[in-house]
Amino acid sequence: LPERDRRARLSLRRPARASRRFHPGPALPQKRGAGYARSRQVYSGQNRPRHRRRGIYRQRALPPGPHAGLQKAHCARFHENGLFEINEELKPRFGSDRYQIVLASIRDRERLESVFEDYRPDIVFHAAAHKHVPMMEINPCEAVKNNVFGTKNVLECCIAYKVKRCILISTDKAVNTTNVMGATKRVAELLVQSLNGHGCEFAAVRFGNVLGSNGSVVHTFQRQIDQGGPVTVTHRDITRYFMTIPEAVSLVLSAGALAKGGEIFVLDMGSPVKIYDLATDMIRLSGYEPGRDIKIEITGLRPGEKCFEELVQADESIDTTSHEKIFVMKSEPVNSSLVLDSVYSLHQVLEQDDEQAVRTALFSLVQRDMHRKTAE
């Protein structure tokens, strides 16, 4: 609490103790804006050798996508402004002869084929996606163009250029989705399963929010705190799963090593975090008292937003793997012909440039039973 010197009219604040409501490890660091991540020791001991299995270690990798936090840890942020910055970070650490930065769009099939032709990757980590839920709600055509048909371009290039393995970075928002972004990622998962078995091992990794990535709630809250508030939360009871950037990268690489083709992996995300509690903790970590120094404002759920996210659908179950933090989905195999025909129909609707029609076709696709038993 503030201690006031009445004569000098100064306010002194003691740093608040880190709350452990969402942080099971050591106290959260006091660094402004970037230090609110859990420490789960994912790089210690037994996790490292897992990346060396089944051809992951020392392979030529192509990680397309602007998934800023995750991609920066993998290799680079693939958008124009970030390319220069990440190149400056990588050069002194690795030397410019160990990597190559390429500017390209996954929607540009000709350019994408040129990149695959030039670099002949052994493994692809596909993280390219438009990922902001409210933005995609008002831009459904762009979401489908990028997240569905951009993904289709990547997968087909993997087959054409004999890539050994391709890992799609998916999201828990693909489960029982109520928003455009999640629906497009669910279609991407179906494409991964449908195109598997054509010479490339395709798999997907599904997880929640990445703490510290660009555009994350942590950055938003810190900016609002720096501005004096209010800190905005859409619902008092809203929860989300969170993972640190190093943890996410480690587990994605490990899942890639486990992949044999056709799997959807689910990561151990721990317990869901109440966003209101996260806001309260961050305010206190900044040396303020919630509700008095910095107010928390409940703004209401945004279009497409759910109060809680799920990791599996009703017709799915999970099984363990050799990695204690990685699980694999168990469900009926998909009907590949049905999926590809449905995606083709979606493309025909997309060409009409009718946003409502695209939205309707998209949700009709993800709500349809795409398993082989449908055709039996």
Regions found by a protein language model. Give the residues of each.
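Helix N-cap at the beta1-alpha1 junction of Rossmann-like dinucleotide-binding domains, i.e.
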Residues: H79-G82, S271
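Flexible, Lys/Arg-rich cytosolic regulatory linkers and terminal tails that connect or flank
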Residues: L1-N47, I159
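N-terminal Rossmann NAD(P)H-binding glycine-rich loop of SDR-like oxidoreductase domains
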Residues: R48-P66
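Strand-loop microenvironment adjacent to phosphate/nucleotide-handling motifs in alpha/beta enzyme folds
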Residues: G33, A37-V42, V154, E189-V210, ...
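Conserved residues in the N-terminal Rossmann fold of short-chain dehydrogenase/reductase
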Residues: V102-L103, K145, H235, I298
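Conserved Rossmann-fold cofactor-binding substructure of NAD(P)-dependent oxidoreductases
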Residues: V102-I123
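Proline-aspartate-enriched helix->loop->beta-strand connector
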Residues: L70-Q71, F116-F125, V133, V163
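Conserved Rossmann-fold NAD(P)-dependent oxidoreductase catalytic core, especially the SDR/UDP-sugar
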Residues: R9-R13, H126, H130-R186, S194-L195
